[in-house]
Protein backbone atom coordinates (compact mmCIF):
# COMPACT_ATOMS: atom_id res chain seq x y z
CA UNK A 1 0.00 0.00 0.00
CA UNK A 2 2.83 2.33 0.78
CA UNK A 3 4.23 1.72 -2.67
CA UNK A 4 0.94 2.56 -4.38
CA UNK A 5 0.55 5.67 -2.24
CA UNK A 6 4.00 6.85 -3.25
CA UNK A 7 3.24 6.38 -6.99
CA UNK A 8 -0.07 8.27 -6.64
CA UNK A 9 1.68 11.22 -4.99
CA UNK A 10 4.14 11.34 -7.83
CA UNK A 11 1.32 11.23 -10.40
CA UNK A 12 -0.37 14.21 -8.73
CA UNK A 13 2.87 16.19 -8.77
CA UNK A 14 3.55 15.49 -12.45
CA UNK A 15 0.02 16.26 -13.56
CA UNK A 16 0.07 19.58 -11.73
CA UNK A 17 3.16 20.54 -13.67
CA UNK A 18 1.57 19.86 -17.11
CA UNK A 19 0.50 23.04 -18.97
CA UNK A 20 -3.21 23.71 -19.40
CA UNK A 21 -4.69 23.97 -22.90
CA UNK A 22 -7.55 26.42 -23.52
CA UNK A 23 -10.39 25.08 -25.66
CA UNK A 24 -10.92 26.44 -29.16
CA UNK A 25 -14.52 27.45 -28.25
CA UNK A 26 -16.34 27.84 -24.89
CA UNK A 27 -19.95 27.15 -24.14
CA UNK A 28 -21.61 30.02 -22.24
CA UNK A 29 -24.01 27.78 -20.29
CA UNK A 30 -21.15 26.22 -18.32
CA UNK A 31 -22.08 22.71 -19.36
CA UNK A 32 -19.87 22.61 -22.48
CA UNK A 33 -16.55 20.94 -23.16
CA UNK A 34 -13.80 22.08 -20.79
CA UNK A 35 -10.32 20.69 -20.85
CA UNK A 36 -9.48 18.83 -17.63
CA UNK A 37 -5.89 17.87 -17.14
CA UNK A 38 -6.86 15.22 -14.64
CA UNK A 39 -8.74 13.31 -17.35
CA UNK A 40 -5.48 12.69 -19.28
CA UNK A 41 -3.93 9.62 -17.79
CA UNK A 42 -0.53 8.27 -18.51
CA UNK A 43 1.51 5.51 -17.17
CA UNK A 44 3.11 8.00 -14.80
CA UNK A 45 5.38 5.49 -13.18
CA UNK A 46 6.89 4.38 -16.47
CA UNK A 47 7.11 7.98 -17.76
CA UNK A 48 8.86 9.18 -14.64
CA UNK A 49 11.13 6.19 -14.61
CA UNK A 50 12.09 6.76 -18.25
CA UNK A 51 12.75 10.46 -17.68
CA UNK A 52 15.05 9.71 -14.74
CA UNK A 53 16.91 7.05 -16.66
CA UNK A 54 17.28 9.46 -19.59
CA UNK A 55 18.85 12.03 -17.26
CA UNK A 56 21.23 9.39 -15.99
CA UNK A 57 22.20 8.48 -19.56
CA UNK A 58 22.85 12.14 -20.44
CA UNK A 59 25.04 12.68 -17.36
CA UNK A 60 27.02 9.45 -17.11
CA UNK A 61 26.93 7.62 -20.48
CA UNK A 62 28.20 8.98 -23.76
CA UNK A 63 26.91 6.76 -26.59
CA UNK A 64 26.05 3.21 -25.57
CA UNK A 65 25.34 1.86 -22.11
CA UNK A 66 28.43 0.01 -20.91
CA UNK A 67 28.26 -3.01 -18.73
CA UNK A 68 29.59 -1.17 -15.70
CA UNK A 69 28.68 -2.67 -12.31
CA UNK A 70 29.37 0.64 -10.52
CA UNK A 71 26.82 2.42 -12.66
CA UNK A 72 24.29 -0.31 -12.06
CA UNK A 73 24.99 -0.04 -8.33
CA UNK A 74 24.43 3.74 -8.40
CA UNK A 75 21.24 3.22 -10.34
CA UNK A 76 20.02 0.66 -7.81
CA UNK A 77 20.98 2.93 -4.94
CA UNK A 78 19.00 5.76 -6.53
CA UNK A 79 15.91 3.65 -6.72
CA UNK A 80 16.48 2.32 -3.19
CA UNK A 81 16.60 5.87 -1.89
CA UNK A 82 13.22 6.71 -3.49
CA UNK A 83 11.37 3.52 -2.55
CA UNK A 84 10.96 1.57 0.64
CA UNK A 85 12.72 -1.66 1.54
CA UNK A 86 9.68 -3.96 1.41
CA UNK A 87 9.37 -7.05 -0.75
CA UNK A 88 7.30 -5.37 -3.47
CA UNK A 89 9.97 -2.76 -4.04
CA UNK A 90 12.70 -5.42 -4.18
CA UNK A 91 10.74 -7.35 -6.79
CA UNK A 92 10.14 -4.15 -8.76
CA UNK A 93 13.85 -3.36 -8.56
CA UNK A 94 14.77 -6.82 -9.87
CA UNK A 95 12.45 -6.30 -12.81
CA UNK A 96 14.00 -2.90 -13.35
CA UNK A 97 17.50 -4.42 -13.29
CA UNK A 98 16.51 -6.85 -16.01
CA UNK A 99 14.95 -4.18 -18.20
CA UNK A 100 17.23 -1.26 -17.48
CA UNK A 101 19.54 -1.85 -20.43
CA UNK A 102 16.84 -2.06 -23.08
CA UNK A 103 15.03 0.98 -21.57
CA UNK A 104 18.21 2.98 -21.56
CA UNK A 105 18.86 2.00 -25.18
CA UNK A 106 15.41 3.21 -26.08
CA UNK A 107 15.64 6.53 -24.17
CA UNK A 108 19.11 7.37 -25.42
CA UNK A 109 17.77 8.35 -28.86
CA UNK A 110 14.39 9.74 -27.67
CA UNK A 111 13.37 12.95 -25.90
CA UNK A 112 11.25 11.27 -23.22
CA UNK A 113 7.65 10.27 -23.66
CA UNK A 114 5.94 8.63 -26.59
CA UNK A 115 5.28 4.97 -27.13
CA UNK A 116 7.71 2.43 -25.73
CA UNK A 117 8.77 -0.67 -27.69
CA UNK A 118 10.70 -3.28 -25.74
CA UNK A 119 13.24 -5.23 -27.76
CA UNK A 120 15.63 -7.90 -26.56
CA UNK A 121 18.88 -6.79 -24.97
CA UNK A 122 21.10 -8.34 -27.61
CA UNK A 123 19.17 -6.83 -30.49
CA UNK A 124 19.09 -3.34 -28.89
CA UNK A 125 22.80 -3.38 -28.23
CA UNK A 126 23.69 -4.60 -31.71
CA UNK A 127 21.35 -1.99 -33.19
CA UNK A 128 23.11 0.81 -31.26
CA UNK A 129 26.53 -0.50 -32.27
CA UNK A 130 25.47 -0.58 -35.89
CA UNK A 131 23.84 2.82 -35.72
CA UNK A 132 26.70 4.60 -33.98
CA UNK A 133 29.86 2.86 -35.15
CA UNK A 134 29.12 1.24 -38.53
CA UNK A 135 28.03 2.69 -41.84
CA UNK A 136 24.37 2.56 -42.77
CA UNK A 137 24.99 0.34 -45.78
CA UNK A 138 26.02 -2.56 -43.51
CA UNK A 139 22.56 -2.87 -41.89
CA UNK A 140 20.97 -4.53 -44.91
CA UNK A 141 23.55 -6.32 -47.04
CA UNK A 142 21.07 -6.70 -49.89
CA UNK A 143 21.10 -2.92 -50.46
CA UNK A 144 24.87 -2.64 -50.22
CA UNK A 145 26.15 -0.93 -53.38
CA UNK A 146 28.58 -3.02 -55.32
CA UNK A 147 31.08 -1.12 -57.41
CA UNK A 148 33.47 -3.09 -59.54
CA UNK A 149 36.77 -1.31 -59.98
CA UNK A 150 37.72 -0.73 -63.58
CA UNK A 151 41.07 -2.25 -64.32
CA UNK A 152 42.60 0.18 -66.80
CA UNK A 153 45.55 -2.06 -67.61
CA UNK A 154 43.33 -5.01 -68.52
CA UNK A 155 41.09 -2.73 -70.58
CA UNK A 156 44.09 -1.30 -72.41
CA UNK A 157 45.49 -4.80 -72.91
CA UNK A 158 42.21 -6.03 -74.39
CA UNK A 159 42.00 -2.96 -76.60
CA UNK A 160 45.60 -3.47 -77.71
CA UNK A 161 44.89 -7.14 -78.45
CA UNK A 162 41.84 -6.28 -80.53
CA UNK A 163 43.82 -3.59 -82.37
CA UNK A 164 46.69 -6.01 -82.99
CA UNK A 165 44.28 -8.68 -84.25
CA UNK A 166 42.68 -6.15 -86.59
CA UNK A 167 46.13 -5.03 -87.77
CA UNK A 168 47.21 -8.65 -88.34
CA UNK A 169 44.05 -9.37 -90.31
CA UNK A 170 44.54 -6.19 -92.34
CA UNK A 171 48.21 -7.09 -92.92
CA UNK A 172 47.30 -10.60 -94.08
CA UNK A 173 44.67 -9.25 -96.45
CA UNK A 174 47.12 -6.67 -97.80
CA UNK A 175 49.81 -9.33 -98.17
CA UNK A 176 47.36 -11.58 -100.01
CA UNK A 177 46.39 -8.73 -102.32
CA UNK A 178 50.05 -7.88 -102.95
CA UNK A 179 50.82 -11.54 -103.70
CA UNK A 180 47.94 -11.75 -106.12
CA UNK A 181 49.00 -8.52 -107.82
CA UNK A 182 52.60 -9.76 -108.07
CA UNK A 183 51.49 -13.11 -109.46
CA UNK A 184 49.25 -11.41 -112.01
CA UNK A 185 52.06 -9.02 -113.01
CA UNK A 186 54.51 -11.93 -113.31
CA UNK A 187 52.08 -13.86 -115.49
CA UNK A 188 51.50 -10.81 -117.68
CA UNK A 189 55.25 -10.17 -118.02
CA UNK A 190 55.88 -13.85 -118.84
CA UNK A 191 53.16 -13.81 -121.47
CA UNK A 192 54.58 -10.60 -122.93
CA UNK A 193 58.08 -12.09 -123.02
CA UNK A 194 56.79 -15.27 -124.65
CA UNK A 195 54.94 -13.27 -127.28
CA UNK A 196 57.98 -11.09 -127.93
CA UNK A 197 60.21 -14.16 -128.14
CA UNK A 198 57.81 -15.82 -130.59
CA UNK A 199 57.77 -12.69 -132.76
CA UNK A 200 61.52 -12.03 -132.65
CA UNK A 201 62.83 -15.59 -132.84
CA UNK A 202 62.23 -16.05 -136.60
CA UNK A 203 64.06 -12.81 -137.36
CA UNK A 204 67.00 -13.78 -135.17
CA UNK A 205 67.18 -17.36 -136.39
CA UNK A 206 66.72 -16.44 -140.06
CA UNK A 207 70.26 -15.11 -140.68
CA UNK A 208 71.77 -18.07 -138.88
CA UNK A 209 69.72 -20.47 -140.97
CA UNK A 210 70.72 -18.67 -144.16
CA UNK A 211 74.41 -18.71 -143.22
CA UNK A 212 74.20 -22.39 -142.35
CA UNK A 213 72.53 -23.16 -145.64
CA UNK A 214 75.16 -21.17 -147.52
CA UNK A 215 78.01 -23.01 -145.83
CA UNK A 216 76.36 -26.36 -146.57
CA UNK A 217 75.90 -25.43 -150.22
CA UNK A 218 79.48 -24.23 -150.45
CA UNK A 219 80.72 -27.47 -148.95
CA UNK A 220 78.75 -29.41 -151.53
CA UNK A 221 80.19 -27.34 -154.41
CA UNK A 222 83.75 -26.99 -153.16
CA UNK A 223 85.19 -29.94 -151.36
CA UNK A 224 88.98 -29.89 -151.72
CA UNK A 225 90.24 -33.45 -151.62
CA UNK A 226 87.33 -34.59 -149.49
CA UNK A 227 87.92 -32.06 -146.76
CA UNK A 228 84.65 -30.74 -145.31
CA UNK A 229 85.88 -28.65 -142.42
CA UNK A 230 85.01 -24.99 -142.48
CA UNK A 231 88.59 -23.68 -142.77
CA UNK A 232 89.43 -25.86 -145.76
CA UNK A 233 86.17 -25.04 -147.53
CA UNK A 234 86.64 -21.30 -147.01
CA UNK A 235 90.25 -21.43 -148.21
CA UNK A 236 89.21 -23.27 -151.37
CA UNK A 237 86.41 -20.77 -151.94
CA UNK A 238 88.90 -17.89 -151.71
CA UNK A 239 91.15 -19.52 -154.30
CA UNK A 240 88.19 -20.10 -156.55
CA UNK A 241 87.12 -16.48 -156.33
CA UNK A 242 90.66 -15.23 -157.12
CA UNK A 243 90.79 -17.41 -160.22
CA UNK A 244 87.58 -16.00 -161.58
CA UNK A 245 88.77 -12.47 -160.93
CA UNK A 246 91.89 -13.13 -163.05
CA UNK A 247 89.75 -14.57 -165.81
CA UNK A 248 87.59 -11.48 -165.89
CA UNK A 249 90.65 -9.22 -166.13
CA UNK A 250 92.18 -11.30 -168.87
CA UNK A 251 89.09 -11.34 -171.00
CA UNK A 252 88.36 -7.65 -170.56
CA UNK A 253 91.86 -6.37 -171.48
CA UNK A 254 91.40 -6.10 -175.33
CA UNK A 255 88.24 -4.10 -174.84
CA UNK A 256 89.94 -1.62 -172.59
CA UNK A 257 92.17 0.64 -174.74
CA UNK A 258 93.74 2.65 -171.97
CA UNK A 259 94.52 -0.35 -169.90
CA UNK A 260 98.17 -0.75 -168.98
CA UNK A 261 97.62 -4.17 -167.57
CA UNK A 262 99.21 -7.01 -169.42
CA UNK A 263 98.30 -10.59 -169.62
CA UNK A 264 100.20 -12.59 -167.08
CA UNK A 265 100.49 -15.34 -169.64
CA UNK A 266 102.01 -12.82 -172.03
CA UNK A 267 104.79 -12.36 -169.57
CA UNK A 268 105.47 -16.02 -169.71
CA UNK A 269 105.47 -15.85 -173.53
CA UNK A 270 107.85 -12.90 -173.45
CA UNK A 271 110.26 -14.90 -171.42
CA UNK A 272 109.95 -17.71 -173.91
CA UNK A 273 110.44 -15.20 -176.76
CA UNK A 274 113.58 -13.86 -175.16
CA UNK A 275 114.87 -17.37 -174.92
CA UNK A 276 113.59 -18.85 -178.17
CA UNK A 277 113.01 -15.85 -180.34
CA UNK A 278 110.21 -13.37 -180.98
CA UNK A 279 106.64 -14.69 -181.26
CA UNK A 280 103.38 -12.99 -182.08
CA UNK A 281 101.70 -12.20 -178.81
CA UNK A 282 97.91 -12.57 -179.00
CA UNK A 283 95.12 -14.52 -177.46
CA UNK A 284 94.93 -16.97 -180.30
CA UNK A 285 98.36 -18.26 -179.49
CA UNK A 286 96.99 -19.20 -176.15
CA UNK A 287 94.02 -20.94 -177.71
CA UNK A 288 91.64 -18.17 -176.91
CA UNK A 289 89.50 -16.28 -179.36
CA UNK A 290 87.24 -13.48 -178.39
CA UNK A 291 84.29 -12.99 -180.71
CA UNK A 292 81.00 -11.21 -180.17
CA UNK A 293 78.20 -13.34 -178.86
CA UNK A 294 76.03 -12.38 -181.79
CA UNK A 295 78.40 -14.22 -184.13
CA UNK A 296 78.47 -17.43 -182.21
CA UNK A 297 76.25 -20.31 -183.28
CA UNK A 298 72.84 -20.64 -181.65
CA UNK A 299 73.59 -24.16 -180.45
CA UNK A 300 76.53 -22.95 -178.48
CA UNK A 301 74.39 -20.34 -176.76
CA UNK A 302 72.08 -22.98 -175.33
CA UNK A 303 72.37 -23.17 -171.59
CA UNK A 304 71.92 -26.90 -171.57
CA UNK A 305 74.92 -27.45 -173.85
CA UNK A 306 78.52 -27.20 -172.81
CA UNK A 307 80.08 -23.80 -173.22
CA UNK A 308 83.26 -24.47 -175.13
CA UNK A 309 84.30 -20.87 -175.08
CA UNK A 310 84.62 -20.77 -171.32
CA UNK A 311 87.80 -22.19 -169.85
CA UNK A 312 87.53 -25.13 -167.54
CA UNK A 313 88.17 -24.82 -163.83
CA UNK A 314 91.90 -25.04 -163.16
CA UNK A 315 92.55 -25.60 -166.82
CA UNK A 316 95.63 -23.42 -166.78
CA UNK A 317 97.11 -25.33 -163.86
CA UNK A 318 97.02 -28.69 -165.56
CA UNK A 319 98.50 -27.72 -169.00
Curated annotation (Swiss-Prot):
Source organism, top-level taxon: Eukaryota
Keywords: DNA-binding, Nucleus, Transcription, Transcription regulation
Region (Disordered): 1-23
InterPro entries assigned to the protein according to its UniProt record, in alphabetical order: bHLH95_bHLH, bHLH_dom, HLH_DNA-bd_sf, IND-like
Gene Ontology molecular-function annotations: DNA-binding transcription factor activity, RNA polymerase II-specific; protein dimerization activity; RNA polymerase II cis-regulatory region sequence-specific DNA binding
Segments of skewed composition (Polar residues): 9-18
GO cellular component: nucleus
Domain bHLH, residue spans: 195-244
Listed GO biological process terms: regulation of transcription by RNA polymerase II
Cysteines paired by S-S bonds: none
Subcellular localization, as worded in the UniProt entry: Nucleus
Subunit structure: Homodimer.
Record-given protein name: Transcription factor bHLH111
Organism: Arabidopsis thaliana (Mouse-ear cress)
Upper lineage: Eukaryota, Viridiplantae, Streptophyta, Embryophyta, Tracheophyta
This protein's encoding gene: BHLH111
Amino acid sequence: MDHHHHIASRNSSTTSELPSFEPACHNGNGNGWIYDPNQVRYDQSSDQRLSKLTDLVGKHWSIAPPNNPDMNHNLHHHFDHDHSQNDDISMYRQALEVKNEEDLCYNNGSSGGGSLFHDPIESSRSFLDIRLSRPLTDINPSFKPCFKALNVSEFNKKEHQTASLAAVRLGTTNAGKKKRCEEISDEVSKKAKCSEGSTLSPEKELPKAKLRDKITTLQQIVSPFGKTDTASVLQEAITYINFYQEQVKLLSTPYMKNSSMKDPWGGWDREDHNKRGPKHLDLRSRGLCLVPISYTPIAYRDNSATDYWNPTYRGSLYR
